[in-house]
Amino acid sequence: MPRTVRMRPRKNKSQALKVDKGCRKGRTYEDFLKFMEENPDSVVCEGDSVEGVKGGKVLLTLFFVQQNLQLAFLRNYNDSRSVTEIFERLYIELRPDIFGKIFDVLLLDNGSEFSNPQALEFDAQGNRRLRVFYCDPSSPYQKGGCENN
């Protein structure tokens, strides 16, 4: 029997999305710790993406640390635009005053889907909605509540 019948053809490698490393300036985990020392009453929300099949639908999970509550939003693609659209929708539906009380600080990993912090932090008029901080690479323990649920 020919060997080609038994083996599947090789898949081409997909091009990885490049993450702008400049977006992390002033948003590192050390900056997060400093901010929390200055603002201990801030509501912290940890965000992460849960992928199933590559190229398939993706979950955006938001874990509220103080409330021990986790929300999940289904996205069609694992890109920055889909994350921004979810926060835009929440901002409109909850109204700015309620959104500001619920989402104060957002702690994220270094995924390409979170590489546009300006769109998350500010609304269309330039008003600050929340503050975005990033965990260090390969440090899932820094947002342990989100990773364990």
What residues fall within each predicted segment?
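Short, surface-exposed basic-aromatic patches at helix termini and helix-loop junctions that form
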Residues: 118-130
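Short conserved beta-strand segments at catalytic cores or DNA/RNA-binding microdomains
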Residues: 37, 48-50, 54-71
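Mobile genetic element proteins and their domesticated derivatives, centered on retroelements
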Residues: 48, 62, 68, 87, ...
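RNase H-like two-metal-ion nuclease catalytic core shared by retroviral integrases
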Residues: 108-110, 132-149
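Active-site beta-loop-alpha junctions of metal-dependent nucleic acid enzymes
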Residues: 52-55, 72-97
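Long, charged, low-complexity intrinsically disordered regions
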Residues: 23, 27-30, 43, 74, ...
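Basic, flexible linker segments flanking DNA-binding modules
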Residues: 1-37
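Acidic/histidine-rich, metal-coordinating catalytic segments
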Residues: 48, 100-116, 138
